[in-house]
């Protein structure tokens, strides 16, 4: 039995995609009460950064990721994106982090996982291959700031290594990891529109997982949208 067959048969995975500050980590924490263990592609990257740069938990996991470190002269978010994309994805292979994540899930005794940082099309494809439900979190107030970059991508014919290098020069806002899924079709799960309070958003994430649990991971709300506030 291949690792993909084993994961599809023995593990239950939901995965959150969306832009930075859309609420992916919050959603992962919200569904932990259903037995889903939060896990991220970036977990090994954060361990590297804390070992090499001695960043604090708040700098790597908390609200200070985008703040420039006074000693190093760059932000933890920037160096994590550089290590994850420019160093590993672009030189070792685009599947390096998704294979790492699937290997960690496969070797774990836990059977339910919530992936909190899906950012690239190949990650969506690999996760769907093992039966994961992909949940797209949209936060309308942060979407418009990336529109100019989407137009530039269209002219270049998509995300290329050259484009990724250009994005790195623009900074974290325009990094390839923030825009690669903009036009990628997500064929499972649902959209959660995060346009209300934090409590409303957490409840929306829980309600979706309740439906997944009730229908034994069926695509009950496939193609629909769940709003975190009353429209």
Where on the chain are the PLM-derived regions?
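Walker A/P-loop
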Residues: 25
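Post-Walker A helix-loop "phosphate-sensing" segment adjacent to the P-loop in P-loop NTPases
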Residues: 32-39
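ATP-dependent NMP and nucleoside kinases share a basic, alpha-helical "lid"
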Residues: 8, 37, 100-152
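ATP-dependent small-molecule kinase phosphotransfer cores
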Residues: 43-111
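Extreme N-terminal, non-catalytic leader segments
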Residues: 1-14
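P-loop (Walker A) phosphate-binding loop of NTP-binding proteins
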Residues: 18-19
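Small-molecule kinase domains that catalyze NTP-dependent phosphoryl transfer to phosphate-bearing small molecules
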Residues: 128-130, 137-231
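ATP-binding Walker
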Residues: 22
């Amino acid at each position: 039995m291949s690792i993909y067959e084993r994961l599809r048969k023995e593990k239950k995975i939901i995965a959150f995609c969306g832009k930075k500050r859309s609420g992916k980590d919050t959603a992962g924490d919200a569904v932990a009460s259903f037995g889903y263990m939060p896990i991220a592609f970036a977990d090994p990257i954060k361990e590297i950064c804390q070992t090499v740069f001695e960043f604090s938990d708040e700098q790597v996991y908390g609200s200070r990721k985008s703040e420039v470190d006074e000693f190093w002269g760059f932000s933890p978010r920037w160096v994590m994106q550089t290590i994850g994309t420019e160093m590993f994805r672009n030189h070792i292979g685009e599947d390096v982090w998704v294979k790492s994540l699937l290997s960690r899930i496969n070797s774990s005794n836990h059977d339910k996982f919530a992936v909190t940082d899906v950012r690239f099309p190949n990650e969506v494809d690999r996760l769907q291959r093992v039966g994961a439900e992909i949940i797209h979190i949209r936060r309308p107030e942060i979407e418009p700031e990336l529109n100019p970059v989407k137009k530039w991508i269209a002219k270049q014919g998509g995300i290329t290594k050259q484009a990724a290098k250009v994005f790195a020069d623009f900074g974290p806002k325009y990094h390839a990891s923030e825009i690669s899924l903009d036009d990628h079709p997500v064929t499972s799960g649902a959209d959660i529109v995060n346009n209300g309070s934090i409590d409303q958003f957490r409840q929306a994430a829980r309600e979706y997982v309740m439906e997944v649990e009730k229908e034994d991971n069926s695509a009950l709300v496939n193609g629909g949208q769940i709003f975190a506030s009353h429209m």
